[in-house]
């Protein structure tokens, strides 16, 4: 009886040890799985961050020229673009800063260079947006029967401006397409001999704000 009892104890002890070993291996496997998952998440996060960096450029690399393609965006992130608008000293009414999100999103939607779009609005409406343009929400002097077309809101006015530029002036086959440069847009948008210099001058003022962003 004693032998059997001891044997039973031995068997039980051996069994308990086996259970403990299995449990230990299970915990180790669980830890390894969690570590693998953490590494995969970290790798995915790193990849996403790399993509964001690749898609956006430093403010130091933003450039403009008179013969630039106006359908090529600046490459700035929205955050940096808003900083640029905040640093735009000519924007005393804060129209450009307050509408920076809308302007940025519309330029993305309609493939328009942000600096050109701001420069054009300023050239046509003034940095502080003249009363007739502010009242009609018409920021690039779109006309009908010799009068500024009236839009219902700032958002609609900006959207129509971007849409018309894209469809009519900056897209091959568009109604008023003459090229993707300032000189090309000028042919039908405003034949005035000083228009290119006016718009580019306003764009240059925006560039001064770009250089202030750290």
Short names for language-model regions:
Residues 1-115, 122, 127-214:
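Catalytic cores of secreted/periplasmic lytic hydrolases that degrade extracellular macromolecules
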């Amino acid at each position: 009886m004693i032998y059997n009892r001891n044997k039973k104890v031995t068997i039980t002890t051996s069994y308990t040890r086996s259970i403990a070993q299995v449990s230990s291996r299970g915990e180790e496997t669980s830890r390894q799985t969690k570590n693998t998952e953490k590494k995969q998440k970290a790798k995915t996060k790193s990849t996403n961050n790399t993509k964001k960096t690749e898609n956006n450029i430093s403010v130091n690399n933003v450039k403009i020229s008179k013969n630039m393609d106006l359908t090529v965006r600046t490459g700035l992130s929205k955050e940096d673009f808003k900083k640029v608008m905040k640093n735009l000293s000519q924007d005393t009414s804060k129209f450009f800063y307050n509408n920076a999100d809308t302007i940025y999103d519309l330029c993305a939607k309609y493939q328009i260079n942000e600096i050109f779009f701001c420069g054009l609005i300023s050239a046509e409406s003034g940095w502080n947006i003249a009363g007739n343009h502010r009242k009609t929400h018409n920021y690039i002097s779109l006309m009908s029967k010799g009068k500024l077309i009236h839009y219902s809101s700032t958002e609609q006015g900006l959207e129509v401006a971007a849409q018309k530029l894209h469809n009519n002036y900056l897209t091959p086959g568009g109604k008023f397409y003459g090229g993707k440069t300032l000189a090309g847009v000028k042919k039908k948008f405003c034949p005035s001999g000083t228009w290119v210099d006016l718009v580019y001058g306003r764009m240059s003022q925006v560039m001064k704000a770009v250089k202030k962003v750290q």
